[in-house]
Amino acid sequence: MERTVTVVPEDGLHARPASKFVETANKFDADVQLGRADEDDLVPAASMLAVTGLGVGHDESVRLVAEGDDAEAALDALEDILSTPEAKQ
């Protein structure tokens, strides 16, 4: 299962949004990978170091790929984090 999402938080996937993203990814029975939409490389969404290491900024598109029993629920929750302004998180 795969989705492409535009990152809305002003700081991109850094600090607080990344922390919430990783925490949420770890709650599901799913293997979730994340990468820039225009690149093939993916990193584990459950790794803070990997997620922040991508350096994804505001208004950039990312690709989420998930497998497992909770794949769709995980993608829904992670998409919600990425498409919500940080002030509302």
Curated annotation (Swiss-Prot):
It is found in: Cytoplasm. It comes from the Archaea. The active site is at H14 (pros-phosphohistidine intermediate). Residues 1-89 form the HPr domain. The modification Phosphoserine is found at S47. CDD domains: PTS-HPr_like. Transmembrane segments: none annotated. Induction: Expression is highly up-regulated in presence of fructose. Keywords: Cytoplasm, Phosphoprotein, Phosphotransferase system, Sugar transport, Transport. One of its GO terms (cellular component) is cytoplasm. One of its GO terms (biological process) is phosphoenolpyruvate-dependent sugar phosphotransferase system. Coiled coil: none annotated. PTS-type transport systems are very rare in archaea. General (non sugar-specific) component of the phosphoenolpyruvate-dependent sugar phosphotransferase system (sugar PTS). This major carbohydrate active-transport system catalyzes the phosphorylation of incoming sugar substrates concomitantly with their translocation across the cell membrane. The phosphoryl group from phosphoenolpyruvate (PEP) is transferred to the phosphoryl carrier protein HPr by enzyme I. Phospho-HPr then transfers it to the PTS EIIA domain. Is involved in fructose transport. This is Phosphocarrier protein HPr.
